[in-house]
């Protein structure tokens, strides 16, 4: 059965908007996905959804260098660097609203449920802070706070934030100290782990991460992007081992659903990996290395059948895959 992608994008894969800064993508190749493309391997095939994530007025939503979140209703929240802040789409890809109020530039997004209410945590890398806000965009918490204290290596370069099953919060300093900090739900520091390097207990860029529930105990799956590898840690930040084969094509982000991890490799493709770390499908794999990992590809050179720079990724509730590119 073919599932949908969106590229924001949606791979139902749903389609998404390519929004390369400095280029007008209002028309022509690369403006939006215009053709449904089947991609992937047998048993793990997806089809792009043309027109998903395109506002009715056809305007470019702005430059993207961030992530997505998906709420329980299936609405998709896409982080932008500009005026829209967080652009919100329903599950059909229709633009519904913007969340502004200082929410631009979220490098990562993750949803949390507290009682009967949903919130989103964002890693706001340019402001050196983590922000928790409700689904209307009202900020309800900011970290670090007075309980956090001094973080080894500082708050600069926060690229990812996760919330564990027990409510602990994890900061990933992928553009900064290359360390991971574990905090209590109230913001108090519990543990600091890692640092710059290529060996055990080190990262060249702990750029993205996801909670992995496929094993007896929950794990953290870290995208060591520039180390071209992925690493499993315990929830207490203890090294378990490298996940899958190396070198990878610079894994930028990961989201796990059921038996599979969906990985955004910034060098031109999305992959699905099983519990053993085997790649079972590659989606919209771009053979043109000159288009990998860049936001500078001219609009007329972008095509419906290939990614350029997948950066953020999330599963949808019905098995969709949503992708934002560095663009």
Pin down the residues of each PLM region.
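Beta-propeller fold detector
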Residues: 47-53, 96-101, 140-147, 190-195, ...
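A short helix->beta-strand "capping" segment at the edge of beta-propeller domains
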Residues: 35-62, 295-300
């Amino acid at each position: 059965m073919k599932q949908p992608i969106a590229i924001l994008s949606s791979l139902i894969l749903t389609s998404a908007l390519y929004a390369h800064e400095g280029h007008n993508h209002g028309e022509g190749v690369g403006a939006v996905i215009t053709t449904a493309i089947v991609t992937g391997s047998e048993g793990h095939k997806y089809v792009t959804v043309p027109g998903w994530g395109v506002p009715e007025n056809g305007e470019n939503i702005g430059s993207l260098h961030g992530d997505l979140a998906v709420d329980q209703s299936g609405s998709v929240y896409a982080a932008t660097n500009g005026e829209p802040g967080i652009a919100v789409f329903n599950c059909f890809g229709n633009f519904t609203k913007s969340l502004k109020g200082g929410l631009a530039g979220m490098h990562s997004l993750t949803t949390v449920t507290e009682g009967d209410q949903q919130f989103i945590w964002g890693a706001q890398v340019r402001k050196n802070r983590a922000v928790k806000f409700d689904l209307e965009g009202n900020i309800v918490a900011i970290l670090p706070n007075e309980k956090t204290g001094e973080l080894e290596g500082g708050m600069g370069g926060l690229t990812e934030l996760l919330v564990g099953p027990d409510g602990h919060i994890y900061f990933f300093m992928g553009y900064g100290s290359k360390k991971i900090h574990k905090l209590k739900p109230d913001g108090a520091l519990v543990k600091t782990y890692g640092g710059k390097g290529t060996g055990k207990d080190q990262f060249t860029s702990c750029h993205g991460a996801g909670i992995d529930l496929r094993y007896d105990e929950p794990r953290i799956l870290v995208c060591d992007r520039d180390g071209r590898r992925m690493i499993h840690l315990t929830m207490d930040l203890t090294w378990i081992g490298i996940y899958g084969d190396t070198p990878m094509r610079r894994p930028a982000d990961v989201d796990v659903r059921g038996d599979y991890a969906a990985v955004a490799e910034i060098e031109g493709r999305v992959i699905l990996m099983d519990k053993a770390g085997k790649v079972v499908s590659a989606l919209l794999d771009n053979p043109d290395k000159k288009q990998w990992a860049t936001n500078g590809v001219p609009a007329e050179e972008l095509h419906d059948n290939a990614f350029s720079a997948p950066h953020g990724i999330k599963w949808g509730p019905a098995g969709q895959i949503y992708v934002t590119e560095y663009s």
